Regions:
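GST-like domain detector, emphasizing the conserved glutathione-binding G-site
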Residues: 1-132, 200, 245
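Acidic carboxylate-rich catalytic motifs and surrounding loops in phosphoryl-/glycosyl-chemistry enzymes
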Residues: 36-41, 183-185, 237-240
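GST-like fold's C-terminal all-alpha helical module
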Residues: 101-219, 223, 227
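Charge-dense, extended regions
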Residues: 232-245
Length: 245
């Protein structure tokens, strides 16, 4: 059976890693049998999660994993036209190459309170003797990545303004559709859910989260996918009733 290596589940969401959540959601949407083995990035190929083992085959990076799943098991995008595939790719790039950095800034740099929540969720599984060292090492590493990407060169207000533009675009593109590309889930939905649940459903507070919660169609979308594909989890609680005053 295919083995998915990812972070330990916490926060009442499928995974606190956007990309782990994306990959597991694709597996569930595609009806592919798998088992999960929790691990940390320092034990992973390329130093990143998720990665999979499929027999003797080992593969890292959610993009390459999903390409493998499409080829060997089931392609959720098989009915999309070339134009629809282009739209899907563009939206995934928005999620994974832009919105991602605003959420990472929220967790690793924005406030000490957010960092403590993030630190506990990721590093509490380590022995105390190495826990703080690993947390400091990875925090500095990710802060350098945020700066190198360019996001970290902006003020907090500017970073969240850019992230809110992404949220507005996602809400407008989804509209009143069941899924982003229509009536059936596609690869874009696996990615969108992974990123939206990690914005709306995690205990990391920021103006970006508040803005995302103000979008009724995005809240309903996250709850709909949670109920359909993660029956072992609860949908958004008070967030589902949230309305911006």
């Amino acid at each position: 059976m295919l083995i998915l290596y990812q972070l330990e589940r916490t926060w009442g969401i499928p995974n606190l890693s956007h990309f782990c959540c994306k990959t597991e959601t694709y597996l569930r949407m595609a009806g592919i049998k798998y088992t999960v083995r929790p691990t940390l990035p320092l034990f992973a190929p390329k130093g990143k999660l998720p990665y999979i083992e499929d027999g003797t085959f080992k593969l890292a990076d959610s993009r390459f994993i999903i390409r493998h799943l499409k080829t060997k098991y089931h392609d959720l995008d098989q009915e999309l036209s070339p134009t629809e595939l282009a739209h899907s790719l563009a939206m995934q790039r928005l999620l994974e190459e832009h919105l991602f950095w605003a959420t990472m800034y929220s967790r690793w740099q924005y406030t000490d309170a957010n960092w403590q929540v993030n630190k506990k969720a990721i590093f509490s599984v380590l022995p105390p003797i190495v826990r703080d060292f690993a947390a400091i090492f990875y925090r500095r590493r990710i802060q350098r990545q945020i700066l190198g990407h360019g996001t970290g060169r902006h003020s907090a207000d500017e970073i969240f303004e850019l992230g809110m533009q992404d949220i507005d675009a996602l809400s407008a593109y989804l509209g009143d559709k069941t899924y982003f590309m229509g009536d059936k889930p596609t690869g874009l939905d696996a990615s969108a859910f992974g990123f939206l649940i990690n914005t709306l459903g995690c205990p990391i507070e920021s103006p970006l989260k508040e803005h995302a919660l103000s979008k009724a169609n995005l809240r309903n979308y996250v709850n709909r996918i949670t109920l359909q594909y993660y029956a072992d989890l609860q949908p958004l609680g008070k967030a589902a009733e949230y309305t911006r005053k």
